[in-house]
Amino acid sequence: MREAPHVLGIVLAGGEGKRLYPLTADRAKPAVPFGGAYRLIDFVLSNLVNARYLRICVLTQYKSHSLDRHISQNWRLSGLAGEYITPVPAQQRLGPRWYTGSADAIYQSLNLIYDEDPDYIVVFGADHVYRMDPEQMVRFHIDSGAGVTVAGIRVPRADASAFGCIDADDAGTIRDFVEKPLEPPGTPDDPTSTFVSMGNYVFTTKVLIDAIRADADDDHSDHDMGGDIIPRLVADGMAAVYDFSNNEVPGATDRDRAYWRDVGTLDAFYDAHMDLVSVHPVFNLYNKRWPIRGESENLAPAKFVNGGSAQESVVGAGSIISAASVRNSVLSSNVVVEDGAIVEGSVIMPGARVGRGAVVRHAILDKNVVVGPGEMVGVDLDKDRERFAISAGGVVAVGKGVWI
């Protein structure tokens, strides 16, 4: 039995998330609440911790206070055993400048790698919804002999132009890596599908350090992991693709096996929530064998009074539904829906209140939004467009703390 390698986790969590505005007006994208009890960053942290990778640095920058607080309050590991999940803000260690890209974030944080001296480094994004066992990907990386392994998910070739696409040979060596090509390549075994990058990488430590340092000296680089570092290593013949469909997570169902969602737009964020609410959900939050850990608030259970009901919905702790109807929706903690109100096909974040007789349809309400008695959201889009953001798919998004 071979000795377990020493692995350091680096989570890239500095994303601004402009396409998720107004949800990112006051917080970093990885801190956006999701699924009634979580933040987006909880998915990658849960995957790493479940795989027993317990030394993790989270690189932050943009409006990181709520993210830093969430990690410090909910992701405490045992310091006695040398375990940690620590947020690392941009520190200007190399001069008076902030991170200029994801690769520059690692370059400015090389001291973390030198201090830990790992054999391998997993560099994962912080804003995707999925379950994955990273240890299987690390094993694949070691066996492949590659310098970097890129996690790839298969999508229909016709839909792949929106992503970074991977062209690999039969052995899994990446021949080309192209951002949003007009003609995406097929996979070696299926010309109708394309490997697209999940933004998750496993590096042999020396390979990452050398590539990051070389990139830092390149004045023409954008200092981006996917745009600069990976193509550099592909050109050197050092990159392999890991087929995410081969990843086997304990307790996964046939429906949510290999589930992965990039929730970088309001429509994608909304659709991922709708994946949670059916009787047999596309993504199952209730897998006890590979749990997603989130907020650890001490709240009372949700309560339904005066005939209030919720159908095909997720309702968070501390919420009260009073003589109201909730359907096909995700409600976070401490949400109140008052008498006669109707909530349909919506995502309601913590502390929001829907007043007596109000109607909320096909909408996202951020934290502490108050919809007054008799008010309507998502019913008249022309009226809503004067006040709120509306996605291309017609989802109405109301920013944090707004009173309607």
Swiss-Prot record:
The gene is glgC. One of its GO terms (molecular function) is ATP binding. Alpha-D-glucose 1-phosphate binds at Y99, G164, E179, K180, S197. The keyword ATP-binding applies. CDD domains: ADP_Glucose_PP (cd02508), LbH_G1P_AT_C (cd04651). The keyword Kinase does not apply. It catalyses: alpha-D-glucose 1-phosphate + ATP + H(+) = ADP-alpha-D-glucose + diphosphate. Pathway: Capsule biogenesis; capsule polysaccharide biosynthesis; Glycan biosynthesis; glycogen biosynthesis. GO terms for biological process: capsule polysaccharide biosynthetic process; glycogen biosynthetic process. Involved in the biosynthesis of ADP-glucose, a building block, required in the biosynthesis of maltose-1-phosphate (M1P) and in the elongation reactions to produce linear alpha-1,4-glucans. Catalyzes the reaction between ATP and alpha-D-glucose 1-phosphate (G1P) to produce pyrophosphate and ADP-Glc. Belongs to the bacterial/plant glucose-1-phosphate adenylyltransferase family. InterPro entries: ADP-Glc_PPase, ADP_Glu_pyroP_CS, GlgC_bac, GlmU/GlgC-like_hexapep, NTP_transferase_dom, Nucleotide-diphossugar_trans, Trimer_LpxA-like_sf. Its EC number is 2.7.7.27. This is Glucose-1-phosphate adenylyltransferase. Keywords: ATP-binding, Carbohydrate metabolism, Glycogen biosynthesis, Glycogen metabolism, Nucleotide-binding, Nucleotidyltransferase, Transferase.
